[in-house]
Swiss-Prot record:
GO terms for molecular function: RNA binding. It is found in: Plastid, Chloroplast. It comes from Vaccinium vitis-idaea (Mountain cranberry). The gene is matK. InterPro entries: Domain_X (IPR024937), Maturase_MatK (IPR002866), Maturase_MatK_N (IPR024942). This is Maturase K.
Amino acid sequence: MEEFKRYLELDRSQQHDFIYPLIFQEYIYALAHDRGLNRSIVFENRDYDNKSSLLIRKRLITXXXXXXXXXXXXXXXXKNKFLGYNTNFDSQMIFEGFAVVVEIPFYLQLLSSLEGKEIVKSHNLRSLHSIFPXXXXXXXXXXXXXXXXXXXXXXMEILVRTLRYWVKDPSSLHLLRFFLHEYPNRNSLITPKKYSFSFSKRNQKFFLFLYNFHVCEYESIFVFLRNQSSHLCSISFETFLERILFYKKIELEVFVKDFKGILWVFKDPFLHYVRYRGKSILASNGSSLLMNKWKYYLVNFWECYFSIWAQPRRIHINQLSNNSFDFLGYLSSVRLKPSMVRTQMIENSFLIENASKKFDTLVPITPMIASLSKAKFCNVLGHPMNKXVWDGLSDSDIIERIGRLYXNLSHYYSGSLKKMNLXRIKFILRILLCGTLASKHKGTLRSVLNRLGVGLLVEFITEEEQVFYLTFQKASSTSRKLYQRRIWYLDIFCVNDTANHE
């Protein structure tokens, strides 16, 4: 009970004052000297980024304030004949300044939490995002997975309300709320899409901070409840009511009615949770009944804690042995790999059948064709289309663009054992290339091939991508043999929307 109270109690020493540094921008550097932010943080840490030192920060803000004053004077003058009136210029300046202010203490808090913790370094990286090793090791023992789209706040007020438990001066929140309501495009700050959320390009840094802080806040509570799920039978439910009061006034009877019948069955110690680009995956080795209870618990959790309505139909539960879930651009599943072992006992021999689980990844052809269709490379059925907008480009630029697209897709999906679907993508891009060049030169496909040379196109667009391997030495092996592990191609800094289907 005391452990819960210590966790659920809001630490007042971590609340921050933001209004004064925001108004007096010249003295924002004093924020780092405010010992009330978090007494456990040593602000003069030598490991702290030198670029954020007090003197440099003060000079930077002073110079920015002078430049901002000149820009504001120019913006407040007559109408710009090229751009017109800049109605949200002041709001953009305020949002950027507020983002800088609020990020400083949370960054310092992050440094404090990392002190004394050793960061585990993986010497066997197997994916572009370094997530497949955890998925292969943890999801291989799971039986069911629930794919849920992260709930988004319907209004910016919900995002601001989450900050009020960390900001102790109401003036900052009122000022922030005022600028949000006065913002010209406040209705398009967060636009819900199919599985993710797109932020306005302007002030993106600040709204990303609000959204990420909101998500991390409910995830921290969710992880805490999940870690204590195996003990819920012997714990009074009133202890969780204390944390709810920080977010919404809820009567005890309502809380018991909504949650008591759900929480007591959560005794699964093998529940895994991962989130990426607005999509969350919960994997468990429990039954479908258990996952259904987690599903409706999440719906009630978001609704009662954060006043967010999450549609239950957007949470899909699949058996990993029979279905695949879309994550990181792959269709992932857990397949049974049968094996036969022969044993000899004195005069008799036996054949023992054994089936082991293996994490398998497939290339999703349907979402890839949908992305190519969205980019006007083909139609919804996968039939190639000519890119008439590329007629102004040179032949080498057209070949380079299409070749780079295919190379990125081939490299990204090189970690999959079954890459037959890439042959269809290769065919679409090959016909697209030839058709675009023929349309540009107003000729036939044969004339284009004769002019450029069949060998160039065949060598460039049909070259088979090699699967990359690394050889590691297994330390635990007594014979010191070498073994091979498949890895994903890592030399990609940007993957187009064709690989990100969320």
